[in-house]
């Protein structure tokens, strides 16, 4: 399940223009981008693109917006190294190269008609936002939707205004937690690990699917809690984080035994990868 690549050649980036740049946290920015030719990116929730900057190289970044939002796509970028630091210097009107979209998306046909538990940790909310927006724009296609989000601290939360809107919406049941809080923070949510948000949930495993996006250290603990609630591995989707260089399964940097994260993933059903060495 993939969108259409920007160009006939998978290796040639297409020119795109930055529309706006928004600060999400002190270390993360949201880039709203459009193709120079005006066409849609053609992605699906869960896919990624390869972003290139002349003189700086290329990096894989998940798409943070839904394909239902026309005229642009968005990328959430954490400043973590040389390339992303260079991206953080860009402003509206600047151009960059985009290859993609690449990878296996969330299985929308299978998600339709199901109750969803969408679990994100840290900057994992950026790719999950693509799926949340899709559900928001097509509410009749899904059952109940629970959004669980955990961050290091209140200031590290992404999309604060959207989190508040989702929390206030009758369409979503939204629960948030942070690992730590100081006396200066104004935060009314829970304090603790994201795993504490799962036991209070009430759902039928036969009609529920969970999706998880976050730091690798989070996955095993979250999966264990979902299993305790009776949710089987074939009803848990995970988006795996790997260093994807080529994006088309040629370089092997993102391999997990016989699978390539850039092509067979990044979204997998848990039963497909839970027994593979190094997957989780």
Language-model regions: role of each:
Residues 2-94, 152-153, 179-180:
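Ferredoxin-reductase
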Residues 4, 82-245:
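FNR/FR-type flavoprotein reductase catalytic core
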Residues 241-266:
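Local cysteine-cluster metal-coordination motifs and their immediate loop/turn environment
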Residues 257, 268, 272-280:
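Short Fe-S-cluster ligation motifs
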